[in-house]
Amino acid sequence: MDNKPSGSKKIRQGDTVVAIAGNSRGQIGTVQSCKGDRVIVQGLNVRKKHVKRSQEAPKGRIVEIERPIHISNLKVCVEGETTAKLKVRTNEQGHRQFVYHKDDQEVVYRSVKKPK
């Protein structure tokens, strides 16, 4: 399995997203890392992991960690808790930008990274 994304990369590290499917549906978090089509979001898809006894943890313990969630189960939040569908537009200088519609106006979310 390769780690290349198969879909769009509208979500990147630092974005605020909301889960639209799964056990964490409706919860909001910040993207910590992206790898392929899976994203780790702070506070979403939290699982418990049982750690065996070792020198670092003499009694053992249970830790809660965020597990990756598929990018199709997330939606970008803009201006707090409102979600928006991002579209790619080219401005006058030829730069590509993600935009969303608000009150029949196109609002720029951020620019798309230029290909190398």
UniProtKB/Swiss-Prot annotation:
Name a biological process GO annotation: translation
Specify whether Ribonucleoprotein is a keyword of the entry: yes
Cystine links in this protein are none
Q: Give UniProt keywords alphabetically.
A: Ribonucleoprotein, Ribosomal protein, RNA-binding, rRNA-binding
According to the UniProt entry, the coiled-coil residues are: none
Pfam families linked to this entry:
ribosomal_L24
Q: Any one cellular component term from GO for this entry?
A: ribonucleoprotein complex
List, alphabetically, the Gene3D superfamilies matched. Answer: 2.30.30.30
Molecular function terms, GO-annotated: rRNA binding; structural constituent of ribosome
Subunit: Part of the 50S ribosomal subunit.
Free-text function comment from the UniProt entry = One of two assembly initiator proteins, it binds directly to the 5'-end of the 23S rRNA, where it nucleates assembly of the 50S subunit. One of the proteins that surrounds the polypeptide exit tunnel on the outside of the subunit.
Give the family per the record.
Belongs to the universal ribosomal protein uL24 family.
- The molecule here is called Large ribosomal subunit protein uL24
